[in-house]
Amino acid sequence: MKILCKFTKLGYLKFISHLDLVDLFQRTLFQNKVDVKFSEGFNPHPRMSIAYPLPLGIESNSEYMEIYLNSRIDLKDFLIKMNERLPAGIKIIEAMYDDDESISNKVKSVVYAFKLLNTFFDKNKNIDIAKELEKINSMDIVEIERKRKKGKRRIFVKENAKEYLKRLELKDDAIYAYIKMSENGSLKPALIFDILNNYTNINIDELDIDLERIGLYQDEDGLKEIFL
């Protein structure tokens, strides 16, 4: 059996690596004597995984983790005890038993919010941001260049970002990017900067925004949440 947990990654802990985050959760599980299931083989380890790890420096209120158990536990008690030991910024918000397929197979899209700072507005005073975003939304082809593996080498290839980028929206002084996820890949947040700078009159870089991952979704349009 397994439980699916929704948790936050905020504040200075947005700079903790994926491996360190996994180690943090494992230690906290052991401290609370949670009956976690271990893998088999010569090097057994706790059976748990975090879906689509965040890049360093990005905050989120909607991260997901699967934990396999040997026996059922009281989930309310689990939430209280885990959060008592986890550092500020990491908090398990919800937990439920889940016998469905792995969460990695459920996720079809991701939504990022590029929260615009004063430096952005200083550089884009006379720009209609919503109108510029609509330019991207109306295009069939938005060419990007990125590295792909070919044999033992990595080469630069040109791709159409619209295969992954569903839409861009301006909401509450933030640019929301709705991005499809598939077996063939997705779009990293950094590529959104290239798209905006190359295909619109918007001038933006990483110093102009605070970046947050809003959530992972079960549909390609970023509407159906994992926890319903």
What are these regions, as identified by a protein language model?
Residues M1-L4:
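Extreme N-terminal starter segment of soluble prokaryotic enzymes
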Residues K6-Y12, I16, D20, Q31:
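Extended, well-folded interaction surfaces typified by the phenylalanyl-tRNA synthetase beta subunit core
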Residues K9, I67-I73, F114-F120, A177-E183:
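Short beta-strand-to-loop capping motifs
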Residues F38-I67:
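Short, charge-patterned binding micro-sites
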Residues N61-A113:
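Ordered, amphipathic secondary-structure segments that act as subunit-interaction surfaces
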Residues F78-L86, N124-M139, I192-F193:
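Short amphipathic alpha-helices in soluble, non-transmembrane regions
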Residues E134-L228:
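Core RNA-modification/binding signature centered on pseudouridine synthases
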